[in-house]
Amino acid sequence: MNWSDLNLMPALPEVALLSLLVLLLPADLWASDDKCRWTHYGALATVAVTAAVQLAVWEQGSTSSFNGMYIADGMSRLAKMVLYALTFVLFVYAKPYNQVRGIFKGEFYTLSLFALLGMSVMVSAGHFLTAYIGLELLSLALYALIALRRDSGFAAEAALKYFVLGALASGLLLYGISMVYGATGSLEFAGVLASSFNEEANEWLLKLGLVFIVVAVAFKLGAVPFHMWMPDVYHGAPTSVTALVGTAPKIAAVVFAFRILVTGLGTVHHDWSLMFALLAAASLLVGNLAAIMQTNIKRMLAYSTVSHMGFILLAFMAGAVGFAAGLYYAITYALMAAAGFGVLMVLSDGDNECENISDLAGLNQHRVWLAFLMLLVMFSMAGIPPLMGFYAKFGVIMALLKQGYVWLSVFAVVMSLVGAFYYLRVVKVMYFDESGRARPAAGGNNAAKSLLSVNALLLVLWGIMPQTVIDWCAKALENTL
């Protein structure tokens, strides 16, 4: 590799993030627990500076670094800006929640920033090894974050289960990558795509490797039948960690899947589309039916996430229009989930965790504004117009219809109607059930509550004017496809 091929400028945001993270680590080591607020502010500043660097090096078109192993294009830039915004917002939500529970420590912020670095590498990968390194950096940080609350047996169990299954998925991914390399002789996505057109490429070995890669992608997205870690992780981890696990990594996983399957394995689109159809149908069915039976709202949101991932998998089947719809859906889902978990964190006052649906009973009688924000989240997740969630589902279904997938579209609509039941049940509990206990003052600080309001109201604003975000997604994919 020539030094001229490095071209660090496109990768400057990751360099800045890593540099600031290295400075934050010893600062946290020397700071006492009661001064962790400076680590909090340092983490917020790190994310803000990284976003500013990304904007400073923003340019149209696609550029690469490290001899094509790192790619900066419209999709990676948009995804990273959303990841930075989500991480910043979740740090603000998490501060008061973590302070009460004794987990307001530097580990939360440093591990979260390492996860952010891993996600940034994933979305900019132009090579299988780059994608794998980013994925492992994200996964290792999440394993430790989930077990952050050392006094919780549920957290330890969830972390162990996620670690074991995650290690298995990583092994399958590596095995699939080795088969792709054996079939094409390349690990660079563009090289794999070019080599797969060659008659000398081993088609059967390529397709066998594809199976292992799709399994790994399905695990990271949480699609059925590789979803069993999600309910335990969502339930066992502190809500501040659940919010992080359930939002930003999903966007990174969607872009990761796009890089590998569309950019690298586009020639076998028919094969992985068939697998995605089966995974999507199973995810929609199992996710919605299992969510109906839940009494714990975090487990309910875990199963609802499974159904949302089913919609994203359907979007991948619909070609270029579907890819834009899938990216839009991922951004919409992340905004909805961040707002939903944010409300739960604010309502978890003192040692009382707001985890069960019954904990929301009569919320409108005590916390009118928070009940309204949660109503917006539930309505958006259910796909009720004119909220953002409606246009996300509508975009995917229209993309499917344009490709002739009528039965899949009908099935998705039916499953959306089934899913609306458990979302509306939460609204019914908040507005029509009587609270069985007196409500103490809600947790959270003014910054968290204000940002939460903006987060939830964006679901309305971008629902009324959805074309703004849709155009962002379409333009992001222009120089990628």
From Swiss-Prot:
Enzyme nomenclature, EC number: 7.1.1.-
UniProtKB keywords: Cell inner membrane, Cell membrane, Membrane, NAD, Quinone, Translocase, Transmembrane, Transmembrane helix, Transport, Ubiquinone
Domain of life: Bacteria
GO molecular function, a single term: NADH:ubiquinone reductase (non-electrogenic) activity
GO process annotations (BP): ATP synthesis coupled electron transport
Function: NDH-1 shuttles electrons from NADH, via FMN and iron-sulfur (Fe-S) centers, to quinones in the respiratory chain. The immediate electron acceptor for the enzyme in this species is believed to be ubiquinone. Couples the redox reaction to proton translocation (for every two electrons transferred, four hydrogen ions are translocated across the cytoplasmic membrane), and thus conserves the redox energy in a proton gradient.
NCBIfam families per record: NDH_I_N, PRK05777.1-5
The family this protein is said to belong to: Belongs to the complex I subunit 2 family.
HAMAP family: NDH1_NuoN_1 (MF_00445)
Protein name as it appears in the record: NADH-quinone oxidoreductase subunit N
Provenance organism: Neisseria gonorrhoeae (strain ATCC 700825 / FA 1090)
